[in-house]
From Swiss-Prot:
It catalyses: 5-aminomethyl-2-thiouridine(34) in tRNA + S-adenosyl-L-methionine = 5-methylaminomethyl-2-thiouridine(34) in tRNA + S-adenosyl-L-homocysteine + H(+). Residues 1-245 are annotated as: tRNA (mnm(5)s(2)U34)-methyltransferase. This is tRNA 5-methylaminomethyl-2-thiouridine biosynthesis bifunctional protein MnmC. HAMAP family: MnmC. One of its GO terms (cellular component) is cytoplasm. Catalyzes the last two steps in the biosynthesis of 5-methylaminomethyl-2-thiouridine (mnm(5)s(2)U) at the wobble position (U34) in tRNA. Catalyzes the FAD-dependent demodification of cmnm(5)s(2)U34 to nm(5)s(2)U34, followed by the transfer of a methyl group from S-adenosyl-L-methionine to nm(5)s(2)U34, to form mnm(5)s(2)U34. It comes from Actinobacillus pleuropneumoniae serotype 3 (strain JL03). Its cofactor is FAD.
Length: 671
């Protein structure tokens, strides 16, 4: 069994006589004993001439990459400086800073907070960062601080750098070549790093580093950088800095069949939806400065699957594909961060008091044991005995299972409607009772007719669940509807003691403010009707009583009120969503009919044929509360041509054309 999440090791930290943090792994200091902050300003900010570059930058985002996050001091210093820049130059074209950093041995949030106490000028940003800092697995974790985005790639940098992939080529404006010194950490300072750096750097992009080692200078020159020397910081005689020549050739696309286009010049975006998937696309697009209009076919928002009174939020950890597990854990951590940001702004019922996974039969028990072998993070998932699980649940259960302490529930309908209302105060336009039909692209815009009027937008995003297949552009997307009915029951004296969500072959939520619980949910594939089903209502309650058969607290349930919410989920057979540019299926199946042989013969392959300015996010199924925040951020980043917070291997798993590309890569025919 592959343990997909235990490859991350934390730093062994000590402090020297100057109270400077020291890595015991590398036997090296994290920053100068003279003045770590001044060293950061001098070496990296001045070395890359950031203040001057920001004033003349001609796009809305600036991307810095750093080779060792360490204490986060470089990030805090440059973030603080960027906030000063925005204050001093409010009309600048540049609006957002992306700071991409790599860290093999992360410090804990407690260690970071201790070190940051020496820099009270950064206290606010440090507190925000350490509050959500939880290195859990290898790969990218995005953190938001208004106009500043921090992406930390945990794990070995030489493994992570290639995972930045095609969408990062020619993307990085400046490098902070930090990390421990070349003689202490020779594994990092090598040709592989320099070659990847050169590919990822924009023409004219720069780097700066504290070292002047000849091996580093020659290595950077060998891959194409122009390398120069300047006075080193403090007692150091010299340091290196340099640039990528303006006339450098762009690196070829490695995966042209998964290629997507961005639209940096387009500002006017229409989003079709009304549920949680569209909500987070809209949120991220607004944060990136776009003008957004939401079109919803219903007379109110959150009328479909996002309209439940209570819904669980937790990651899907059961999967044979470790990329899927990594995706869901990334999503979960990002969702928790987003919820903490929205919580002060919007009123919605929620309680992150945990989710109990009940082992109602031997098969489920073995499945939970398998998951436990894939993670050593008890804050995410922990096996429990019957006594332990009973204590977590608040009611006695005869079997054990597992507990996910950071998970919980929220009210989707309150959350979605409340957050959309908040976003209207930030410029979002919402149009209800408007079904977008038969959109056509011409002269750089998408157009459609509604009630005798023409509506036009530069970009169209389809985040409309199972109705996606009504658009002819979605031909070939193997989406199918799943009808679900969630039952609502009045509480009982026993059920009022329920502390957390309980999952079995269904789920039961704790009591809401309305003194009700939700029991869910039926699963009827290929059905899109939303009528009340008495049979499904009875089945929901029966599942609870049958799965927790020895629990007398399940027996006194009153189901006579026949209260339930029906919704239709959009699902995909491989159980992960789709996000990206809309692929043109009819063209791609011809374009790539000989893909297997082209790759085998190392022949050139065209970039994928997609519909211009048309994007989608779909297939969230029953995991929308967990996955929608990161999916929305990914899609907005793609549209805006800004760094994606996900590794390339997972991005390919989420690609809208993945089902037929997989077949074509094997030499199979696609009809």
């Amino acid at each position: 069994m592959v343990n997909v999440m235990n490859t991350l090791s934390f730093a062994s930290l000590s402090f020297n006589s100057n109270n400077t943090p020291v890595s015991e792994q590398f036997d090296d200091i994290y920053f100068s004993t003279q003045d770590g902050l001044e060293e950061s300003y001098y070496v990296f900010q001045d070395g890359n001439q950031l203040w001057q570059k920001w004033q003349t930058h001609d796009v809305e985002s600036f991307v810095i990459a750093e080779t060792g996050f360490g204490t986060g001091l470089n990030f805090l210093a440059v973030a603080d400086k960027f906030q000063q820049f925005l204050s001093e130059f409010p009309n600048s074209k540049l609006k957002r800073l992306y700071f991409i950093s790599f860290e093999k041995f992360p410090l804990t949030s407690e260690q970071l907070a201790t070190i940051h106490k020496n820099y009270p000028q950064f206290a606010t940003l440090s507190q925000k960062m350490t509050a959500c800092w939880q290195p859990r697995q290898t790969g990218c974790q995005r953190y938001h601080f208004e106009q500043i985005y921090l992406d930390v790639w945990f794990g070995d940098m030489l493994d992570n750098l290639p995972q930045l992939g095609d969408l990062y080529t020619n993307r990085i404006d400046a490098w902070f070549l930090d990390g421990f010194s070349p003689d202490k950490n020779p594994e990092m300072w090598n040709e592989t790093l320099y070659r990847q750096m050169f590919s990822l750097t924009k023409n004219g992009g720069s780097f700066a580093t504290f070292t002047a080692a000849s091996t580093v200078r020659k290595g950077l020159q060998a891959v194409g950088f122009e390398v120069k020397k300047r006075k080193g910081f403090g007692k150091k005689r010299e340091m290196l800095w340099g640039e990528k020549p303006q006339q450098s050739e762009t690196a070829p696309v490695n995966y042209p069949y998964f290629y997507s286009e961005s639209q940096t010049e387009a500002n006017d975006i229409a989003v079709v939806g009304g549920g949680v998937a569209s909500l987070f696309v809209v949120l991220s697009l607004l944060e990136k400065g776009k003008k957004v209009t939401l079109y919803c076919k219903d007379n109110a928002l959150a009328q479909n699957a996002s309209g439940n009174l209570q819904g669980a939020i937790y990651p899907q950890l059961s999967d044979d594909d470790e990329r899927n597990i990594r995706f869901y854990v990334h999503c979960f951590d990002y969702a928790l961060q987003r919820l903490s940001q929205i919580e002060p702004l919007v009123e919605f019922e929620h309680a992150l008091t945990g989710v109990a996974l009940y082992a109602y039969n031997d098969k489920t028990a073995k499945k939970l044991e398998k998951i436990a072998r894939q993670t050593n993070d008890d804050s995410l998932f922990k096996l429990c005995s019957a006594a332990e699980l009973s204590e977590k649940i608040g009611l006695k259960v005869p079997n054990g299972g597992a507990f996910m302490p950071q998970s919980g529930w929220l009210s989707p309908i309150q959350f979605v409607q409340g957050t959309f209302a908040y976003l209207q105060t930030k410029g979002l336009q919402i149009v209800l009772n408007h079904e977008v039909k038969d959109p056509q692209f011409s002269e750089g815009k998408w157009h459609w007719q509604h009630n005798g009027k023409t509506f036009s937008h530069q970009i169209l995003v389809l985040a409309n669940g199972h109705t996606l297949t009504q658009f002819q552009q979605a031909q070939g997307i193997p989406l199918y509807p799943v009808r679900g009915q969630v039952s609502q029951i009045p509480t009982t004296p026993a059920l009022q003691q329920l502390k957390c969500v309980v999952c079995y072959d269904g789920y039961l939520t704790p009591v809401s403010k309305a003194n009700t619980h939700c029991i869910g949910a039926s699963h009827v594939r290929d059905k899109a009707e939303t009528y009340f089903s008495l049979e499904e209502h009875h089945e929901n309650v029966a599942k609870l009583q049958q799965n927790l058969t020895a629990c007398d607290w399940t027996q006194g349930i009153d189901e006579s009120q026949n209260l339930a919410k029906q919704g239709v989920r959009a699902a995909l057979r491989d159980r992960v969503p789709m996000v990206g540019q809309m692929p043109n299926f009819s063209v791609q199946k011809v374009q790539y009919q000989n893909l297997y042989n082209q790759l085998r013969r190392k022949q050139a392959v065209e970039n994928a044929a997609n519909f211009a300015n048309l994007y989608m996010v779909n297939g969230l199924a029953s995991r929308g509360l967990t996955t929608a925040p990161l999916l929305g951020e990914m899609l907005a980043s793609l549209i805006c041509d800004e760094p994606l917070p996900i590794s390339e291997d997972i991005w390919h798993v989420l690609s809208p054309n993945r089902t037929w590309i997989r077949k074509l890569l094997k030499g199979s025919k696609v009809e």
